[in-house]
Amino acid sequence: MAQDLLLEIGVEEMPSAYMPRVLKDLKDLAQKNLAEARLSCGEVLTLGTPRRLCLWVKEISEEQEDSLLENRGPKKSIAFDANGNPSKAGLGFARSQGVDFRELQIREVSGVEYLFAIKKEKGQAAEQILPGLLLKVIHSLSFPKSMTWSYYQTRFARPIRWLLAIFGDKNVEFNIENIKSANYTYGHRFLSTGVLLVTSIDDYFRVLREHYVILDQAERKKMIWQQVQKVAGEAGGKAMENEELLEEVAFLVEFPTAFYGEFSPSYLDVPPEVLTTSMIEHQRYFPVYNNEGRLLPGFVGVRNGTDYCLDIVRAGNERVLKARLEDALFFWNEDSRKSLEEMSAKLKNVLFHERLGTLADKVLRLQKLALFIGQQTGLGQPEKLQRSALLCKADLMSNMVYEFPELQGIMGRYYASGSAEEPEVAEAIFEHYLPRFAGDKLPSSAGGIVLSLAEKMDNLMGCFSIGIKPSGSQDPYALRRQALGLVNIILDKKLSIDLKLVFEQAYLGYKDIDLEKSREDSVKELLDFIYQRMRGVLLDNGISYDVVDAALSRPSFDLFETYYRAFKLQEFKKSPVFEDFMVVYNRVHNLSRKWESEEIDLDLLVDESEKNLCQKLPGLQEDIKKSLIAQDYTRALELLAALRADIDQFFTAVMVMVDDERLKAARLGILKSIANMFNSIADFSKIV
């Protein structure tokens, strides 16, 4: 009869950021190891709090499935003597396998016959397998950072304090260092005392709840959000949903209780982003807003415990937040006394990168590159682009951004507005960092778009030119994110821009620096890197992999043109004339792929079908060229598909690979001319 398995790893408080990943890994490792152990099971669940990781596997089979072991022995020619009797080698193999020679089988492997011993191995009881299996699962868990404790060698995210393991109604016995698995657990650190005996899996969940532990993280999240909404509503406001904060708080507490706190309205003079950053990033509070979306002088915090002495908890949290907001107000007032130009003057004292100069050097590069991109795209006014680039890094010298680095750009916009800079300049200063993370908004103003592209292209070129590029999971300079941001901006804004030209210009910005790589190598590597991101974007947008391969195989440095062409190819693939199109392509491509010349000696052509086809080529080539310039890819594709009848007639009437070399060359020239029209759109040999 199948039984449930429960494992609880009791630990010191785990970092909340580790929890989602480790619970997923725990589930995956359990499923993988159970399958490898030939133990069938039902649903696998992982639950967790800061102090415990729980694995619950339903309906594990009582014993392993039986298995067949196949061991290969000597060749048949060696296993038998000349008279067909078992040789010493054959008998020795049977003896080593513990089977009678007559039970051996003869099987062919790669044309050679061998002896095989087929043995049935009976599965072991699950309770014999599980101790080693659970040990393996626990030791296989990995973390961003791990530690040892006491004098032990085991590494884990935090010290392991207890282990509970139950299979059905029995303990699963194993130990890690001096910690032995048992049938007891512990409740809430402050609201429960002593050991809690667990007699069954059902009993485990009941006991924890009675001792102030809500084990299911999904239930805790739901409780927290309901309480936060209720508390904020009672204070006359509302909390904005923040999934990331909600998940983090859920993994900080075992028994959540929300409370409302207040701060002085005078702090509302500080930009709201500063206040919410203090509340969310530093204190894990939920800011409270009125119905118009304006920040109120209050917050909702979540306590790890009951409502006992909640007023004292509230007062303590208000004191901590007040200290932070007092600092923020001071920074705001101090920074507001300086202009952005004063701050910008200090950039010469700060390194952008030890091998790429100072931030002041970077600003000069951005000014030149922004002008160049503005000319390429027709976006922005030169003087405003220059001004935006000059001031875009100035807020890095402010007290506020030094204290709150995540507010770079945001504070720059406020300081620019306070310094009477034009609105377009202030907006570009903020937007040049966009997008900052996956799913973030893209820049929308002309200056913001240009400066954001310049920022990312300069960063990418600088890193690639000194040999810094992502490898595996390592990407310390977030180059993948910046490249993807660049791609998304270009596609979203439908910008036609020659990336090769702009990257070459970006390289020139580093002309006074001793770079590791040449301009040609740097630009080539960067374009390859960008098109790897482009490939992912195309696939994510529903373009089939073969169409993506076909479109990307034709060199183009215009990302939007490539995207639009791939989209039209995908659309055309569903067209009723697509079959005609591919027939024409395959017939001309297969014969002409090794032929280079489009030269055709008209005097050598003898059949009307080849003369007719040849006469159509100049007009067709001109029409295809015009269609590609106009990016009317559908028309170009349909024109080529319309050649089906002419191509069929051509191949019916003439033989291309004739003995007459000059005639063969003329006919291959016709086919190559047609093939090259296909190749000017995409590499259709990739289509499946």
UniProtKB/Swiss-Prot annotation:
One of its GO terms (cellular component) is cytosol. GO terms for biological process: arginyl-tRNA aminoacylation; glycyl-tRNA aminoacylation. The keyword S-adenosyl-L-methionine does not apply. Keywords: Aminoacyl-tRNA synthetase, ATP-binding, Cytoplasm, Ligase, Nucleotide-binding, Protein biosynthesis. It is an enzyme of class 6 (ligase). PANTHER family: GLYCINE--TRNA LIGASE, CHLOROPLASTIC_MITOCHONDRIAL 2, GLYCYL-TRNA SYNTHETASE. Tetramer of two alpha and two beta subunits. This is Glycine--tRNA ligase beta subunit. It comes from Syntrophomonas wolfei subsp. wolfei (strain DSM 2245B / Goettingen). The gene is glyS.
